Amino acid sequence: KEFGVESTDIFLPDCFGFGWTLPTIAAHCSLIGFSSQKLDWRVHPFFGKSKHPFTIGVWKGIDGSSIMLAHGYGYGKRWNDVDLSENKELMELAERTPLKTVYRYYGTGDIGGSPTIGSVRSVEKGVKGNGPLQIISATSDQLFKDYQPYKEHPELPMYDGELLMDVHGTGCYTSQAAMKLYNRQNELLGDAAERAAVGAEWLNLADYPGTFLTDAWKRFIYHQFHDDLTGTSIPRAYEFSWNDELISLSQFSDVLT
């Protein structure tokens, strides 16, 4: 269920702002949609009285390419065994958009974990319910697929610009640039080491160093955490992070040499 599945959307509930290049890069990677809930963390409104341009619509990138954008309304929502087809909060959220549609995250956000039993039962009751709301339990990209192609849906509002934060992680595209450099070097060197190791074993020149490579991968991937690689941790933390990144670079280099 986890492997061999191709993603068609960008699912970033808890990242720190989104550049104007994101829809362009996503569209050229054949992705069709993007969702987050982070913009509600803004201190000040950016679009009139709202913190985001719309809840569901189309986001245009710097070259005119576009993807669909949906606002997830918080990542820690829980319900306690209720019929969501009659949920007043969802009704109110639906009224905020001309589409009369709500894209809603739920589960145990931030600290991690699956949705509670009560939340799952609520969704199941909502799907089978007879209230005024039609509840659809779906993958994160289903809404985007339902509106394909976007050009045939003029009712979708469009935004052309950046979606930046004004607090909590602002500037993380450039903060701790060394971490970003080391991470990318490890990704490239790790890939090269894997290919070389497989080729060497196929030619009966050397045994595949599976344990060694796994250790190298895990050591630097561990730091692809959104308060580490992004550059939002305290300075002291990066003394440990840099060390791990450099050890992995050395390990991958050893495989190649």
Residue ranges of predicted features:
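Catalytic-domain carbohydrate-binding cleft regions of carbohydrate-active enzymes
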Residues: 1-257
